[in-house]
Amino acid sequence: MSEINISAAAVKELREKTGAGMMDCKKALIETSGNFEEAIDFLRKKGLAVAAKKAGRIAAEGLTAVKVDGLTGVVVEVNSETDFVARNARFQDLAKDIANLAVIAKNIDTLKTSKMQSGKSVEEEIIANIATIGENLALRRMDILEISEGAIGSYVHNEVVPNLGKISVLVGLVSNAKDKAKLEALAKQIAVHVAGNNPQSIDDSSLDQALVERERKVFFEKSKEEGKPDNIIEKMVEGRIRKFFSEVVLLQQNFLFDPKLTVAEVIKNAEQELGAEIKIAKFIRYELGEGIEHEEKNFVDEVAAITRS
């Protein structure tokens, strides 16, 4: 069976069809004597054994996805090992389907056991796709935003297809404003702002106090090294803390679409225009792979290894 001549074109076609790795596609065609449909089934049947082998590999690529359903929105992150797989329609459909289920599931544990259209749970569907695609895949995280009234704005940066991309943001504005279109437009603009400016909290009080104290200590030590008197140091530190807040607190940041105003001032102006109070209930910002250790790869060596196999 190993003597069968498998063309590069056939391997390429099978890879495009299934998203599986090149060597897996070649092996599938050899094992099935070049029968294309049987090769697809062969890849699917590899299942759990393949998934177990792939599970130890770093999955830091992939996609973030958003789904908004009325006054509920979710963001999920589904990881793959390579950007090539993230551009595959099969993987994109998987991420989109998981996001759709997340709106109903509301938490990641329930989401993992939720049933997909195939009848498999999300976890089982991911394992099946590991077998077919040939890379480690993972549902890494999800978050949900729910409001009682108002509008949810969403934005996806570096969008590859609608609602899927590298950075996904949701912003929930609570308000009883009658003009929903203007409220939704404001929520959308703030979502774009959050994507670009990466705030750490909505206001001062919700900012991690450990982070504030760490910054305060750094500023104090730096000012002390400059040989300033203690009373001057205290004023300098407070000034730097205020600047720090303006950089990381959403309401204090200069608004992306009108830097002369802070986000708080933009909201205040909108309240006057719409005749109703507007409050940012929550924002979610997912950036693909943040916090994951990336494995450095040499592409030339990787291709050479495949060629030698």
From Swiss-Prot:
Subcellular location: Cytoplasm
Keywords: Cytoplasm, Elongation factor, Protein biosynthesis
Region of interest (Involved in Mg(2+) ion dislocation from EF-Tu), residue spans: 82-85
Chief location of this protein within or outside the cell: cytoplasm
Entry superkingdom: Bacteria
Keyword flag Cytoplasm: yes
Name used for this protein in its record: Elongation factor Ts
Gene source species: Rickettsia akari (strain Hartford)
Gene, per the UniProt record: tsf
